[in-house]
Amino acid sequence: MAAITPTEGQRHLLERHLDELDVWNRRLNLTAVPRDRAWERHVEETLGLLAAAAVPAGAAVVDIGSGGGIPGVVVAVMRPDLTVTLIEADRRKAGFLIHIAGLLELGNITVAARRAEEMGGDPDHHERHDLVVSRATAPPPLLVELAMPLLRPGGTLWALVGDAPAAAGALGGRAGVRAWAAAPGILAVEKRAR
């Protein structure tokens, strides 16, 4: 797994995102991670996910329960070739995501102020995405239920979780998916082709 390092311009955008996240967090409770640990917890962990996932050029990505934009905004900054949809049911948090996408001039982001369950049934999103990413949104079995309708056959869910081997083991017998611990703290679940 090759390390991914932000350019100076990307680092600037990511730092602005973290600064805004810190300011807005006082009103919206977007993250429990303090600003002095945000780079490590938000950016570096997402960079690890991107390195493990080896996302193909031009892929369609969805971040379920985006909240403060982790990992979705980091993915959009690091990979401007991707189209990234940030799903956030809380309209106030979705407002933050719209603000940050505009502030950072991220034209590859779309914000959907909806529930993931609704998006999976929407013909514009049902089985239209190559990759679903998420962090601390739901227990892995529920996250898989939310992600599978959004993924194309062969698409993959990449989730930042605490114990990836245990999460993968809990999903081992689930029909239609293949789960594995891709790296420490990273769960991968592939939607099998029909």
Model-identified regions with their sequence ranges:
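Class I SAM-dependent transferase core
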Residues: M1-A57, V62, R92-I109
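Conserved S-adenosyl-L-methionine
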Residues: D63-G67
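Conserved SAM-binding loop of SAM-dependent methyltransferases across substrates and taxa
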Residues: G68-D81
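S-adenosylmethionine
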Residues: R79-T85, A89-R194
